[in-house]
Amino acid sequence: CIIEIIDGVQVFRLSAFKTVDIGNIKRGINEILLPFIMLYRILKSNFPIKELNAIVWYSPTIFFGPLVKVLKSSSNCPTYLILRDIFPEWALDLGILKKDPIYYLFKLVAKYQYSVADIIGVQTSSNLKYLESWVKKPNKKLEVLNNWLSLAHSQKTSISLTDTCLNGRKIFIFIGNMGIAQGMDILIDLAESMKNRQDVGFLFIGRGTEVENLQTSASDKKLDNILFYNEIDSKEIPSLLDMCHIGLIALDPRHKSHNIPGKFLTYMQAGLPVLARLNEGTDLVDLIKDENVGRVYIGNEVGDFRNLAEDLIDNENNLKAMSERGHFLSQKMFSSNHAAKQIVSSLSSYI
């Protein structure tokens, strides 16, 4: 256990098993073991387990229920679960899981995690329906807690496009996780459909289970308007986005649960209009349209998607206006200060 002081706050850091960039089976085992390893190391340290005023934790993962239960019982304090992914439901939607014993086991684990929470904050109003039975239990509170993004501390990016095939082009950028849940293939198809436009390029930054497949697809299609880079330090992102023009968002249309990806907040903070391919019914569709900060597509026809892309990139005056609205939206709805105040206010009613 390592103890640090960050901005006047005492932080206990615990070593943990790796849960990213590994196979699904190993990841599952590591996530199952993680809360028990953390609890063991907490109990072996000087962590003030009986002096907690509140517990706030984040999901994914679904496996922290036992850890939170012990901490809550020791301190007799209220708990707040920030619920971002409705798992295992989204994995069922995408065909990753079937309604077999494994699915029902995960569902039971998630249900237990919900049971130790006094308050649950979901990302969008569309996700409230998944917890209708939970909120009917005594002393439970369910609310929408918007995603948030702190003000970025910028440093010069390590990525330079000057000597690449994207030099001088208007850049569509995707930054973040590239996995099954994103449904990224349509972005490669979009790049292929625009390969004859020498003024447009595509930049993909991040990691995930689908990166290698996406790179192979781009190579097979002989695309010279697309580049891939591994994830970079978050402090480099603002200066990187300064070189770009449109932020890309993709969610697999089979999703039935809904969220607002963190990359949307990143783009808004940077003043980048967005081109989003989303699942039907998600709150982000209406948000982008109502605030007029980009274009949204629901479907699988790359020609229609391209039309929206060109509508964005070819209208510089509109891009500038969208950029200004994005900055305003970021400050209005997605500040970390607003989220912190909401969490503290909700917990205060239980103290």
Segments from the language model and where they lie:
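Carbohydrate-associated surface elements
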Residues: 126, 145-148
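Conserved donor-binding/catalytic core segment of Leloir-type glycosyltransferases
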Residues: 149, 163-182, 188-191, 203, ...
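An aromatic- and histidine-rich active-site surface loop
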Residues: 27-42, 52-77, 81-84, 89-90
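Nucleotide-activated donor-binding/catalytic signature segment of Leloir-type glycosyltransferases, i.e.
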Residues: 203-206, 211-238
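Membrane-proximal helix-turn-helix segments that form the acceptor-binding/catalytic region
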Residues: 43, 63-66, 70-74, 100-120
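A short, well-ordered alpha-helix in the C-terminal region of glycosyltransferases
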Residues: 304, 311, 318-333
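Nucleotide-sugar-dependent
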Residues: 182, 233-240, 247-268, 274-286
